[in-house]
A protein has these predicted regions:
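Tryptophan-rich substrate-binding surfaces of secreted polymer-degrading and adhesive proteins
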Residues: 456-457, 463-523
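Glycan-recognition patch characteristic of GH18 chitinases/ENGases
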Residues: 28-182, 412, 422-423, 427
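Glycan-binding loop/region signatures in secreted carbohydrate-active enzymes
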Residues: 32-58, 99-121, 135, 151, ...
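Short, acidic/polar
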Residues: 68-84, 166-184, 240-251, 289-293, ...
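Substrate-binding surface in catalytic domains of secreted glycosidases
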Residues: 63-64, 100-124, 196-345
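Fungal secretory targeting signals
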Residues: 1-48
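Conserved, mostly hydrophobic/aromatic
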Residues: 89, 149, 192, 213, ...
Length: 523
C-alpha cells in the first residue's frame, strides 16, 4: 500500500512537471519592489467606459493586502482606505526567523513610528504610531473591519525562511510569537504567505503549524472571553506545481479562509505571452482559477472558506503580435519591470480586449506590439458572480495601493456585486498590549458594530438565541441552524445527536467534511 501510494504520487508529480509551464516563482508580485521608495513611473492612459453593477447578493468577504512600503513611492496611506468596501485588511509583510521561528516586523518607521495627521508628538507613555496605529483606529471606527498580520510573501519566503516548520520547537516559538503580535498590535488574526511548501516535510510541518495556531487562537479567545474567534488565513497557490504537496484537510480544519493567489499565471518566465489570471481555459499554461478552486475543494477545502484572488496590476509583454505569441522584453513597469499598476492601465494607444469564454482581459497596442494582461471591471464582475454561484467566501486583492478609485475600482466593483459584506465583529480589547494607547482604546469609546445588515443580507442568530432542540442531554442546548453562529465549546443538537463546536463556525453542518464539530453521541 505504501509503495503504491508513493508510485502514484511520483507519477502525479511527473505529469505535473511535464504538463505545466508555471514555475515556483509565479507569485513574485507579492513582494516588496527593490525601488519601493521611488515614485511610480507615470504613463498616459486610455479612457475605458465604467461598468455598471446591478446584481446584489448575500454577505461576502472582501479582503485586501495593504503593504507597509506602499506609503513611500506609491504614497498610499492608511487614510486612503475605503473601509465600507472591505471586510479584511491583510497587513503585509512581517518576517520570520528560520533559526528560531520568531516573528518580526520589517519596517519600524512605517509600522510603529510614522506620525500621521492627528498624532501627538508630546503625549506621555509608550504609544504606538505608524500604520499599525492607523489600522487600529480604522477598527475602532468600523467594528466589522478585521485586520490581520501577514507573514512571509515572496521575499520573506526565500532562503529557507519557512524551513522552521519542520521543527516542533521552532513551530511552538512561532505560535507564541503570533499570539504576542495579536495582543501587542491589536490584530484580529494572522495570515501566512508561505511560497511554497514544495516537499512532504515542509507541507506536513506547515499543516502542523496551522493546527497549533488554531488551538492557540481558540485558547486566547477563551482566556479573554471574546465572543468571536481570532482568524487564521493562508495565501495559497493556484498552480499545481506549488499546491501538490499541501495537506488540505488538516489545513482546512485550522483555517478561517484560503486566500487563493489566482494570478501570475503568465509572465517573464514563459517564452510566450498569455493571460495572467484566467478564470477558465489555460490550455497553454495548464493553469486556471476554476481548475485550482475545484482541486482545493476536491481535496478537502470548504468552498465557503475560499477567497478568490484578483490582481490590481497587469503583466506586460513587449514586441509581440498577441496572446500566445512570442515576445521580446517585458517593459519598464510602474515600480518594477514587467508589472504595471492597475491605476496606469490601459496604457495610452492600447485597445482593450475581453475574452468572456476564458474570462480574461488584456490591452494591446499593435503599433508597439505591447500587451498587458490585467482584469477590467467587467472581468472582475464575472469573477465575483462565479464566487456567488460556486458558494465561495469572497474576493481577495493584491494590493490596495494599485487600485483605481470610484466606479473603476475593482474592490468597489466586486463589493457592488456582493451587495452585503461579512459583518463579523473585530477585536478591540487588548489589555495585555505593550502599547499604552492600544490598551486604552486610544482613549476613546469605539463605535458600535453594525446592528443592521445591508439589504439582501441573510439573518444571522447567535447560538444562545436559537431554539432548543431535543430531550435528554440535548434538552438545554440549541438546535443546530445554518444561520446560527457557534463558538468553540458551544453545543448544538442535530439529527438526534449532541455536537460540540471545535471553534467558531457558521453554516458548517455537524458531521460534515469541514470537521468543525465533535459528535458527543445520541441525545
Amino acid at each position: 500500500m505504501a509503495l503504491s501510494a508513493t508510485l502514484k504520487r511520483a507519477f502525479f508529480l511527473a505529469v505535473v512537471a511535464l504538463s505545466a509551464l508555471v514555475v515556483v516563482n509565479a507569485t513574485q508580485a507579492m513582494q516588496r519592489p527593490d525601488a519601493f521608495k521611488d515614485a511610480p513611473r507615470k504613463f498616459a492612459t486610455s479612457e475605458v467606459k465604467p461598468q455598471v453593477i446591478h446584481k446584489r447578493a448575500g454577505s461576502k468577504v472582501q479582503a485586501a493586502y495593504f503593504t507597509n512600503w506602499g506609503i513611500y513611492g506609491a504614497n498610499f496611506q492608511p487614510t486612503d482606505i475605503i473601509p465600507s468596501t472591505l471586510t479584511h485588511i491583510v497587513y503585509a509583510f512581517a518576517d520570520v526567523s528560520p533559526d528560531t521561528g520568531s516573528i518580526s516586523l520589517t519596517d519600524s518607521y512605517a509600522d510603529e513610528q510614522k506620525h500621521f495627521p492627528g498624532d501627538s508628538w508630546d503625549e506621555t507613555g509608550n504609544n504606538l504610531y505608524g500604520c499599525l496605529k492607523q489600522m487600529y483606529l480604522l477598527k475602532l471606527k468600523n467594528r466589522n473591519l478585521k485586520v490581520l498580520l501577514s507573514i512571509g510573501g515572496w521575499t520573506y519566503s526565500q532562503s529557507g525562511h519557512f524551513n522552521f516548520v519542520t521543527d516542533a520547537t521552532k513551530r511552538a516559538t512561532f505560535v507564541t510569537s503570533a499570539v504576542s503580535m495579536i495582543e501587542n498590535y491589536g490584530f484580529d488574526g494572522i495570515d501566512i504567505d508561505f511560497e511554497y511548501p514544495t516537499s512532504d516535510p515542509l507541507a506536513s510541518g506547515f499543516a502542523s503549524l496551522l493546527t497549533s495556531l488554531r488551538t492557540a487562537f481558540d485558547n486566547l479567545q477563551k482566556q479573554k472571553g471574546d465572543s468571536v474567534p481570532y482568524q487564521l488565513t493562508a495565501a495559497v497557490p493556484a498552480g499545481s506545481d506549488n499546491y501538490a504537496f499541501l495537506r488540505v484537510p488538516a489545513m482546512n480544519a485550522a483555517l478561517s479562509y484560503w486566500n487563493l493567489m489566482a494570478y501570475d499565471y503568465a509572465g517573464s518566465w514563459l517564452t510566450f505571452t498569455d493571460n495572467q489570471a484566467n478564470l477558465y481555459g489555460g490550455v497553454r499554461t495548464n493553469v486556471s482559477t476554476d481548475k485550482a478552486v475545484k482541486w482545493y475543494i476536491a481535496n478537502g477545502a470548504s468552498a465557503n472558506k475560499i477567497n478568490m484572488g484578483i490582481p490590481l496590476y497587469g503583466r506586460a509583454f513587449e514586441k509581440t503580435t498577441g496572446i500566445g505569441a512570442a515576445y521580446t522584453g517585458i517593459g519598464p513597469g510602474t515600480t518594477e519591470a514587467g508589472i504595471y499598476s492597475y491605476t496606469a492601465l490601459p496604457l495610452a494607444g492600447a485597445q482593450v480586449f475581453e475574452n468572456l469564454t476564458d474570462v480574461t482581459s488584456y490591452s494591446f497596442d499593435s503599433s508597439k506590439g505591447e500587451l498587458v494582461s490585467y482584469d477590467t471591471p467587467h472581468i472582475a464582475t464575472i469573477k465575483a458572480q462565479y464566487v456567488q454561484t460556486n458558494g465561495l467566501a469572497g474576493s481577495m486583492f493584491w494590493d490596495l495601493s494599485t487600485d483605481k478609485v470610484g466606479s473603476d475600482s475593482l474592490v468597489v466593483t466586486t463589493a457592488g456585486v456582493y451587495g452585503s459584506l461579512d459583518q463579523t465583529q473585530n477585536h478591540i480589547n487588548f489589555p495585555n498590549s505593550e502599547w499604552d494607547n492600544i490598551r486604552n482604546n486610544m482613549g476613546s469609546s469605539p463605535s458600535a458594530p453594525s446592528s443592521t445588515a445591508p439589504a439582501g443580507s441573510p439573518t444571522t442568530t447567535s447560538a444562545a438565541s436559537a431554539p432548543t432542540g431535543g430531550s435528554g442531554q440535548c434538552a438545554s442546548v440549541p438546535a443546530w441552524s445554518s444561520g446560527a453562529i457557534f463558538t468553540g465549546g458551544q453545543q448544538a443538537s442535530y439529527q438526534g445527536h449532541l455536537w460540540t463546536a471545535k471553534w467558531w463556525t457558521e453554516g458548517d453542518t455537524p458531521g460534515g467534511a469541514a470537521g468543525v464539530w465533535t459528535d458527543n453521541g445520541a441525545c
